[in-house]
C-alpha cells in the first residue's frame, strides 16, 4: 500500500526522468539550454552570504526565453542534473554571468532516480523547453528554507 508521500516522490522522479529523456532526443540539442529562475524567488530573498561575492553589482534580468549556458558552470561536459540544496540566502543568482556561477558547481551533484520527499504545497515547477528542466521548491514547513534547483544540461 502506497503512502501519499511515496506516490508524490514516485511521480516526481518519473517526471524528472521523462523530461531528461525527452531533452536527450530533441532535434535542437546543442551546447546551450534555456534556463529561467523560479519566478517566486523575489530579488530580496537572494541576499548575499559568505558563499557569494557581495561586491558584485546585481545583474539585470534577461528576458524570458533567452538562451545561455546552464548557469551553474561553463565547464560541464555531459548531460546531467545539477542539484543545489541551499539556504534561501545562498541561492545563486541564475541571471548573473557564468563566471559568477561556477563557485556553486561543486556544492552538490545529483543523479537520476534520486528520491525527493515533498508535498504538493512545497512544489513549484516550470519547464521552458524540451532542452531544459527547472524545478524548485520552498519548504515552508521548516524554519530553514531549502531551495532545490535542477537544470538539464546539454553536451558542449
From Swiss-Prot:
Subcellular location: Nucleus
Keyword list, A-Z: Nucleus
Biased composition (Low complexity): 48-59
One GO BP annotation of this record: positive regulation of transcription by RNA polymerase II
Gene Ontology CC: nucleus
Disordered: annotated segments: 46-71
Tissues in which the UniProt entry reports expression: Expressed throughout the brain in the thalamus, subthalamic nucleus, corpus callosum, hippocampus, substantia nigra, caudate nucleus, and amygdala.
Main function: May play a role in FOS signaling pathways involved in development and remodeling of neurons. Promotes transcription of the FOS promoter.
Entry protein name: Protein CROC-4
Lineage: Eukaryota, Metazoa, Chordata, Craniata, Vertebrata
Gene behind the chain: MIR9-1HG
Amino acid at each position: 500500500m502506497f503512502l501519499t508521500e511515496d506516490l508524490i516522490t514516485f511521480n516526481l522522479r518519473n517526471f524528472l526522468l521523462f523530461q531528461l529523456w525527452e531533452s536527450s532526443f530533441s532535434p535542437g540539442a546543442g551546447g546551450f539550454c534555456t534556463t529561467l529562475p523560479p519566478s517566486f524567488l523575489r530579488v530580496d530573498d537572494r541576499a548575499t552570504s559568505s558563499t557569494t561575492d557581495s561586491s558584485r553589482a546585481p545583474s539585470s534580468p534577461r528576458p524570458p526565453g533567452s538562451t545561455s549556458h546552464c548557469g551553474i558552470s561553463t565547464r560541464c561536459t555531459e548531460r546531467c542534473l545539477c542539484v543545489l540544496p541551499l539556504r534561501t540566502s545562498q541561492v545563486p543568482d541564475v541571471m548573473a554571468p557564468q563566471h559568477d556561477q561556477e563557485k556553486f558547481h561543486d556544492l552538490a551533484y545529483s543523479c537520476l532516480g534520486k528520491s525527493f520527499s515533498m508535498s504538493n504545497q512545497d512544489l513549484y515547477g516550470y519547464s521552458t523547453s524540451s532542452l531544459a528542466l527547472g524545478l524548485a521548491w520552498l519548504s515552508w514547513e521548516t524554519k530553514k528554507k531549502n531551495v532545490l534547483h535542477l537544470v538539464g544540461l546539454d553536451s558542449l
